Amino acid sequence: MNAQEANFDGLVGPTHNYAGLSFGNVASLNNEKSAANPKAAAKQGLRKMKQLADLGFAQGVLPPQERPSLRLLRELGFSGKDADVIAKAAKQAPELLAAASSASAMWTANAATVSPSADTSDGRVHFTPANLCSKLHRAIEHEATRRTLSTLFADPTHFAVHEALTGTPALGDEGAANHTRFCAEYGKPGIEFFVYGRAEYRRGPEPKRFPARQTFEASRAVAHRHGLAEEATVYAQQDPDVIDAGVFHNDVISVGNRDTLFTHERAFVNKQAIYDTLTAALDARGARLNVIEVPDAAVSVNDAVTSYLFNSQLLSRADGSQVLVVPQECRENANVAAYLDRLAAGNGPIHDVLVFDLRESMKNGGGPACLRLRVVLNDAERAAVTSNVWINDTLFASLDAWIDRHYRDRLAPEDLADPALLDESRTALDELTQILRVGSLYDFQR
């Protein structure tokens, strides 16, 4: 059956700020306490969505989550009216207010792991929201993520939306940022590739400086609940040294699409064995793996982390050629820019490079790949998505005007204490649910 890969980008929320919450994420730590521009952030992401939609790619949008999270703050012991809760948190524990106010759900690569119907035992598209249990500000996302996915992908004939795995370190799950899929064609059975940072119950190398957020046990559990064939599921360990260099998810050091793996030479432990396993598995599915390995001598791990070369989108055009979507920081790094010029001029599958200004997201450690969740849908499955979430001229104009009406153009850490920010955010989100036709999605609407 004909199928297409859709990208569902997260719309940046009104509380986008730089609180430095993500240990192991170099950009997040380096920009802590800077002033952010939520309006610019949202518009940068929206423009990327629109340009890709204009190029013929299936492009959807996922709404922001409600922030600040009053539920979290009340759970942590702050009481009173909403304004009182925010004031108390700001005075007594500003770091907790920052966690409750994070707009990190914009990075939908961490929202869930998705397996298309061609790969699953029951022939449905399966979603497992990521528990993101390694960081407080992200661990509060999965319930709202499940509600959103269950709203958009509501037909049980076509879709299965699971609950997140239990939020324990042994099952630390960071979603699609550590998962990719290889196939001959999107609608045919493929190979699902899970990358983990450490294993809880068996010995192996681990990073020493920064935490490994994804466990083997979590990856395996997701594969099992999605009903994936064992012979079509491959696991690999990320090199702990690159985690210590700031590669906190695999999508900061490699990206895959269809028959192509674009990766840094230092991405994996026992890389040749991984390449061989992937090659054999994909060969059984009727395709030949094409590995584009970037040598450390051309692009160092530090270059990769600062430019986010691999936190790119690798997209297939209708004619089979591939385009690489990168942040503008790739053009500002001489080594990376030179490599991309050689890549596009070569005879490989990647023929074009598209460059986007995503500066606001990048300063928090999120490039093009972080902002999108890949969902392969056949024609019947796409028709079952009835919400108004597919980017076109009309929706783009509505969302662009909505951002103008509701978003601030400056938000510093101290502004999180402003009780008006909660009211502004709720007003914006209430209107957004009408634009997207997703019903009463948020707690404050119920």
UniProtKB/Swiss-Prot annotation:
Keyword Cell division annotated: no
Pfam families in UniProt: AstB (PF04996)
UniProt-recorded Gene Ontology molecular function terms: N-succinylarginine dihydrolase activity
GO BP, one annotated term: arginine catabolic process to glutamate
EC number(s) reported in the record: 3.5.3.23
UniProt keyword annotation of Cell inner membrane present: no
Binding site for substrate: 19-28, 110, 137-138, 213, 251, 364
Job of this protein: Catalyzes the hydrolysis of N(2)-succinylarginine into N(2)-succinylornithine, ammonia and CO(2).
Family note: Belongs to the succinylarginine dihydrolase family.
PANTHER family, per the entry: N-SUCCINYLARGININE DIHYDROLASE
Protein known as: N-succinylarginine dihydrolase
